[in-house]
Amino acid sequence: MDVRIVDFLETRVAVLEHHGPPELEHQTARRLVQWRLQHRLPPDRHRTYGVHYTDPRTTPPEQHRVDFCVSVDEDVAPNPEGVVTKVIPGGRCAVARHLGSRANVSAAAHLYEVWLPKSGETLRDFPIFFHYVNVGPHLQDRELITDVYLPVR
């Protein structure tokens, strides 16, 4: 798997937080998609991210946590949907590309379990995050592209 080091630019994001079982993530993501449509934030101009605070392989389902995000130019106004403003910090990141289904993004495990121990790099104080390069109901699993970012010093 090809891993490269990039300088990620600080990115303001609109966030809908998911707390709970991984198998219910699609419900949270769907709510963010609806909010995104209402606010006219198309994916070709506003990137889609997932900030993964826990590993669903090792975390009890009730403690699992992911932020589903859309890049925005301005802070999000208070709203009934619970979408809030956060920032994905800028800095060095190791990046690996995952092609295919997002049900099991193997690039994340590769970065942590294979690449990191051999790299000589150390982690920064921000969790792994995914850039969902292409999104939409018209895409087949085999067409999905996900860039996985691991913040390093």
Predicted segments, located by residue:
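A solvent-exposed interaction/effector surface
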Residues: M1-R153
